[in-house]
């Protein structure tokens, strides 16, 4: 599908006008805006309303030939009535439109994600010149009629804005008109909480407000971000979900809580809003459609769209190279699968050696001459990996490991300095290629043996899971009535099938870590020698003639800003990226900055994404496009992506494009989407936990990880769980407990030798605690919400719940089953978890509710880890199949049992078929 067809598809579905350059019958080029009324796919013609841009006149055209359209661009901020019949016909009969819109299902998903990404930004008020044309009081009746002069001025303004947008390239600065519904006058400026978009109805020469209201839970004022949670308590936050119905309640709540500090304003005036989107995904996503057009789709992209129906069979065994011997079987299996297969999903619960697995995967890829793009949504995980790779040493000297840390302008400046530093360091190192790896043949032979053992280990895990499932099926059957009809089947399960599984497991035998480690190269000194000299060889390549153009950039440091700009320009070309990989085969950057690496095409052998469960779906595709293979590392039980797109807008976009649940931008991370869409690739669980005292992590293990974690930590703390009951008394402010702050300061003062983290779910409580830390001068104590501590660890964690007599049901409902918050907060503690709460208020809020994770955690800590923990239903391959705990699974078991009864009672022969087309099952 070319870009013209794609823009036509988008204009039809989004109800927008399209700017076109058209070759008319006389052979002249003319420029129009067109509003599409209908489409004839057979004759490839459009029925449109057209605005002639030179004359600014509007007329109807019944036959615009699509093949005569030379270029197109969506007119953002315009309104065209949607042809619902046409949209439905495209959805129901895509084959009719195949010559125009190939892969319509994929196109809908990409258009949806592109729109979500554009709108997932913090808005701000801006001096938009169109505001002066409109009086908000006149928009009350549904639209604002424009005079001929106003209309011409506005069309000219739209044209100028579109031209600027074309020149801006990959960065988007969106400006739009909006009709105020509710704003808050704060001391810093105007916070626009709710508005309706005003769109240009070109045909009627009027501005038309959206039917739907947009809610801004976050807004930028004077460069500082404001959040609605500052003006509404959690109890009242839910009122936003039905804004129109609850408008008066919202106004009253803001006024009651904030008084004169925040004055609400519901006057219907017109405002200019701006949004800065770091990346325009249009060209990135076009590359995906081009892959399908050319039939050169990579495995990761096929898996994303659910097109991977069979796991590729790979027989090659890759030698595994390790930086250290701190490795276990699960980590080895993760590395092996990442090397061997096009997709590998690694679930890394807290403290299971996720970073170590990534480091060894990167080094193994380097050892096997692979290129790697390592990315994540934020800087912390990629900085950690870069720091470790760039600080490797051999006999007291730094290993010039060929890795680049790229990113924004400052990171690029640092990168240039780093490259030049490496050039100087390797200058005097003599490298003899013949001695770099004398034992390569031995390594390959060992790799084959290790690959075989890991395959057996994977098979044992699979057989064990099957055995668990078989046991669960039998337990289900025993609970059924009329089980006599299934007696023979039940006996077969209990006897032959269960025995077969046991025999297979016994035949393979136990796969120990000692067996696997024996097949690894244990000569660490020799391997670091290899890394030292091989890395130097890579860096020395920079001095060859082929890099003369790059050296010119690296050596010209007169203006570091111009130098960085020149280096960025160099990296924009795919041929330069491929050339640079000969020196730096490993490149590290954020998901957003990945777009700076060449064109959107497969440039790397492998993309590795860390914290994939925190990466949003739309932007994550940018680094994924650039890799032939993909390794996603994350944990869906920890923090989710931070999404600003409001729920109402998301629902509207999903309806518009008929987007399935697995691609829901607000509800999914890239990790969750891939697991939902790829049914054939394995997910590996890193089961060995090394961080927390056993009693601390046991709560998380039983609650969130199906008791799959094996605790290997060496903490010997005798009292790892401490509950502090704090009588908070009447509070002056919601979501604060000064009494808990006092207890925290007392403990911190008595334990200056401990690294301490204080985690609280509430901003107001955090402010009080931070004030106390500053006043007491505690340098060993840090405080924050859970997002500040993802991936971190401390000797002691104090969890301040800050429940008080002013805490309402809505606030507690948000807190009690916030699994990401509770899981991350508790699993940061290595030796001691101290939980502070007002027991009286906790009992009041709990109200005997069975489903309450926070209450269970308090009881667990109170009883020193001896209380009962109810498991959360987790949809995860890596954590094993949950036994029929959903309606869908129960219905499946009921239908399966019914089918088996028929088979056993009728004694008919039967066969099992996989991947049967629905058309063969249901006949007309």
Regions found by a protein language model. Give the residues of each.
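Conserved P-loop NTPase motor core of helicases/translocases
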Residues: 89-92, 96-102, 133, 288-298, ...
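A helicase ATPase "motif cassette" and its flanking acidic/Ser/Thr-rich regulatory loops
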Residues: 82-222, 490-491, 497-500, 509, ...
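Core beta-strand-centered patch of the WYL/Sm-like small regulatory domain
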Residues: 1-88
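Active-site metal-binding core of divalent-cation-utilizing nuclease and nuclease-like domains
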Residues: 28, 905-924
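Pre-P-loop entry segment of helicase/translocase ATPase cores
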Residues: 188, 192-337, 412-430, 434-436, ...
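Helicase C-terminal subdomain and adjacent C-terminal extension
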Residues: 646-684, 701, 773-775, 808-913
